[in-house]
Swiss-Prot record:
Pathway info: Amine and polyamine biosynthesis; putrescine biosynthesis via agmatine pathway; putrescine from agmatine: step 1/1
Name of the protein: Agmatinase
Function, as annotated: Catalyzes the formation of putrescine from agmatine.
Species this chain originates from: Shigella boydii serotype 18 (strain CDC 3083-94 / BS512)
Enzyme Commission code: 3.5.3.11
Taxonomic lineage from the root: Bacteria, Pseudomonadati, Pseudomonadota, Gammaproteobacteria, Enterobacterales
Length: 306
């Protein structure tokens, strides 16, 4: 049995090649990979425009434009020479069965983490982060969350599968510690009593990158960190292809600098979510997501090279 069931089951939304043209490996548990990329083509929990199930394919497709650069600016080294990264394709589940997706994703993540691998996941809508957090918390214990988004996703509407409730549920399950967690780029209403430090888009756009990063490091401390990036954190001028766009967001330049600034954190898991290519223009949203994902891998490679 392969990693994800049958690698052809999701062929309507899957790719023939891996992210950045990295090797495809449908048996990553026994591989010597440091990081494993998993696509999660799921959008049943969205409250806005659907289409996030096509996000992983769009990110991989456009990533070929990034594969040529070896001594990537401004890092001046090739991530692939420091990290062993493989792409295991997309999670296979019965489309239409949100619970099965959640259970299979958590089981897949638990097996990878138990084998000593780290995960970079592509959504899919943001709900996919919750089963990933459950798996990571089993392995690493309670974590800090560094969360880029236009929305806090801390809404308590009682729905089991909703991409706006994960970070209300996760603290209650003991997966993350809100007092050591930061939400960056927020520009919609939220409950100020949830314990998270919220750095709204207005202040993040006005403050220096170094100042924001210093505050993030102070809040997170030395806890294990899960990094999640909802692409709607970016302004729709830079990322129109998403389900719930909100104007007044971060530029792609500011976002990439902030991600680079997280290099010294103890990041144990990462994801990029909410790319919906049906609403994209010239693949700029997918390109932003692919570039941010690549930068996430570079901050890991930079630490390994020290």
């Amino acid at each position: 049995m392969s990693t994800l069931g049958n690698q052809y089951d999701n062929s309507l939304v899957s790719n023939a090649f891996g992210f950045l043209r990295l090797p495809m490996n449908f048996q990553p548990y026994d591989s010597d990979a440091d990081w494993v990329i998993t696509g999660v083509p799921f959008d049943m929990a969205t409250s806005g425009r659907a289409g996030g199930r096509h996000g992983p394919a769009a990110i991989r497709q456009v990533s070929t434009n990034l594969a040529w650069e070896h001594n990537r600016f401004p890092w001046n080294f090739d991530m692939r020479e420091r990290l062993n990264v493989v792409d295991c394709g997309d999670l296979v589940y019965a489309f239409g069965d949100a619970r099965e997706m959640s259970e299979k994703l958590q089981a897949h993540a638990e097996k990878l983490l138990a084998a000593g691998k780290r995960m970079l996941s592509f959504g899919g809508d943001h709900f996919v982060t919750l089963p990933l957090l459950r798996a990571h918390a089993k392995h690493f214990g309670k974590m800090a969350l560094v969360h880029f988004d236009a929305h806090t996703d801390t809404y308590a509407n009682g729905c089991e599968f909703d991409h706006g409730t994960m970070f209300y549920t996760a603290p209650k399950e003991g997966l993350i510690d809100p007092n050591h967690s930061v939400q960056i780029g927020i520009r919609t209403e939220f409950d100020k009593d949830n314990g998270f430090t919220v750095l709204d888009a207005c202040q993040v756009n006005d403050r220096s990158v170094d100042d924001v990063i210093a505050q993030v490091k102070q809040i997170v401390g030395d806890m294990p960190v899960y990094l999640t990036f909802d692409i709607d954190c970016l302004d729709p001028a830079f990322a129109p292809g998403t389900g719930t766009p909100v104007i007044g967001g971060l530029t792609s330049d500011r976002a990439i600098k902030l991600v680079r600034g997280l290099k010294d954190l103890n990041i144990v898991g990462m994801d990029v979510v909410e790319v919906a290519p049906a609403y994209d223009q010239s693949e700029i949203t997918a390109l932003a997501a692919a570039t941010l994902a690549l930068e996430m891998l570079y901050i890991q490679a930079a630490k390994k090279g020290e």
